[in-house]
Curated annotation (Swiss-Prot):
A Pfam family: DUF4149
Subcellular location: Membrane
Alphabetized UniProt keyword annotations: Membrane, Transmembrane, Transmembrane helix
Organism: Danio rerio (Zebrafish)
Identification of the protein by name: Transmembrane protein 205
Length: 188
């Protein structure tokens, strides 16, 4: 492992804690919390909660990934990297970019369109049902009758899909780096 000096125990612990924090947060938000929430509250409550939590989530990811990249970069100068370390550095960098795209662009754009959709849905008595499969025909009818709603829905799903893709790419990057870190531990 190419390094410019050995990291202190504090730096090692910080690096491990930050990576673990970002990975655990991604697991919780991406694979658990949303599915539990959508099955327990109305669609509009779900959207409102997500609109408040996601900015915090994306900025925590951005900060955590940036700290991980910075710590890794300090102890792995570019001139001394082998190909494994180059891949790790690239994965940290990609994770930062993905979190940044979500925090600055995809998340806010999806939220903005969702809030417009919710206003239109309220006017038509939709959004108070629990779960996604409730009253599908009402949403289909609204899409067919209201071009503004249809446009915002299309834009929302585009940004939501891009946000999910960025989130999964970032999760993959951090997972690979966490696995690599675990495989290189001296002991547990």
């Amino acid at each position: 492992m190419a390094t410019e000096g050995d990291p202190t125990d504090f730096v090692k612990v910080l690096h491990l804690l930050v990576i673990s924090f970002t990975w655990g947060m991604q697991v919780w938000v991406s694979f658990i919390a949303g599915f539990v929430l959508i099955s327990q509250v109305s669609m509009h409550t779900f959207g409102l909660v997500q609109s408040k939590l996601f900015p915090v989530y994306f900025y925590c990811l951005l900060g955590g990934n940036a700290v991980s990249l910075a710590v890794y970069a300090v102890y792995h100068p570019r001139e001394l990297l082998d190909w494994h370390e180059g891949i790790q550095m690239s994965l940290f960098f990609v994770a930062v970019i993905m979190a940044g795209l979500n925090a600055q662009w995809f998340g806010p754009s999806a939220t903005e369109n969702m809030l417009v959709m919710q206003e239109i849905e309220k006017e038509h008595g939709l959004g108070n049902q629990v779960g996604m499969s409730s009253n599908r025909e009402g949403y289909t009818k609204l899409r067919e009758q209201d071009p503004k709603y249809k446009e915002h829905r299309s834009t929302f799903y585009r940004y939501h899909g891009l946000s999910n893709l960025c989130n999964l790419i970032g999760f993959f990057c951090i997972t690979v780096n966490l696995i690599y870190l675990a495989l290189n531990l001296g002991t547990i």
